[in-house]
Amino acid sequence: MERDQASKFINDLLKLMVSRNGSDLFITAEFPPAIKVDGKVTKVSPQPLTPNHTLTLARAVMSDKQVADFERTKECNFAISPAGIGRFRVNAFIQQGRVGMVMRTIPLTLPTIDGLGVPQVLKEVTMAKRGLCILVGATGSGKSTTLAAMVDWRNENSFGHIITVEDPVEFVHPHKNCVVTQREVGLDTDSWEAALKNTLRQAPDVILMGEIRDRETMEHAVAFAETGHLCLATLHANSANQALDRIINFFPEERRPQLLMDLSLNLRAMVSQRLIPKQDGKGRAAAVEIMLNTPLISDLIFKGDVHEIKEIMKKSRNLGMQTFDQALFDAYEANVISYEDALRNADSLNDLRLQIKLNSQRAKSPDLASGTEHFAIV
């Protein structure tokens, strides 16, 4: 396969993925090209790719510098925007001595908080003058999309300087009421460390720093919040509690009391997200858990009593907080998701089942009683 053929082949696959509203394209040796739609991977060709195919396809979407970096490090992250097709985040890697790629769709239209259907309290969080807001979720849970919607809201509703440090830049934000500076690691700066070190010299109001991966990145995030900036970041975890545990475990035992004090003073919000298949089969809906740093939450963080936070969240919906199970109950009650999917994604299956049994109007509906639903409340 020649480079021109490889470029056309990739573009045809990307067009197909876009036409099916797919989220990811998988290129791997000894397996046909495949796309993920609504969380399910589907082959799009009967013919497996050879190792030579995957190598040629990867090189076809890379610049010469990226090819050299990939050969040296065996990893490469970048974004591409083939004309008339869209924008995609690319991760190239080696697995079992062979080249593989995953190409993720980045919508060209910026998402909005209203359009995503996420809680309105995120608008308030996004407009905070200072503090740390961390978006939590597994890979593919929509963290980057929600974060882009939050940045766009701030861009439209304030006047300041927003800086993003990303690897790679995903959503491209135009200047609206804010100046938006987007820096890509490897393209606009040599490293995360160099970019983050110099960020405070660029007079920012909001700093989006991508993923918190280690202690050093976490230290930068806290420092940005302490110096009067709003810092937005992501973290791989399944819930607010798990995220706090993971952050604490970044640090050695002797550093943790200081960390807990810093978090208690500077954390603004912890937003956890999961994508649940919609009942009508048309896409997925976001179930969002929100922890806001109220005085009571702050005190629990300071003391290290992280395990007690979820109970406070359950009782603080009037303040804008909610747990995953409360979000799932609301989505089920609104006929957005099925009973099975609600329970499948619950933090506490028994608690959610009981909540639906006792409080759900949908569960008491005639349709359910007549057996037209394919589940039973027990």
Task: Give the location of each predicted region.
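Short, flexible helix-loop junctions that flank or precede catalytic/ligand sites
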Residues: 1-378
